[in-house]
Amino acid sequence: PGVPDRAFINDIRADLHDTDTVYVALDNHKYGDFSPYLLVSKNRGRSWKKITNGIPDRHLVWRLVQDHVRPELMFAATEFGVFATFDAGKEWHKLSGGMPTISIRDIQIQRRENDLVAASFGRGFFVMDDYTALRDIDPDDFDTGAALFTPRDAYWYFQKRPLGYRPKGSQGDSLYLCLLYTSDAA
């Protein structure tokens, strides 16, 4: 729907949670068209729907990645940064977090730590550490202006000092031993 015939396919992603759903990111910038083209099919490609609401004009979409836990949470790498949707593409929101406004050409999720990794065009890569709080966002809560999230379990680290290991090393606090070895040249 509304995609030029000669648009280039940047990314095709099968839905991680629904075998009938597929996403496609396209661009037509070689013909002077910088519009975002991001489509979804919920019937294995027989029909398509555009899902770019909230992604501004002239923001090419390069890649798309879906959260492996919450199906509605997705991230799009665009010409001017990263966007997130919390409702399966009905509305997109720009993520910044100090990342410069640059072309993000690839985006992946590191599943073990739930990190979002975004690679730019010429500026390096950026990591959003442990984005699991984003899974708790309800799109209806955007009008409130603030939200509290449940933190993940954390470990409290206590340094163990079985032999003291203070200023005098393994000798404890009360004993300091210095040995000097010399060779007899007799």
Language model segments and positions:
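Short beta-strand segments of immunoglobulin-like
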Residues: S174-C178
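Beta-propeller blade termini and top-face loops
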Residues: P1-D173
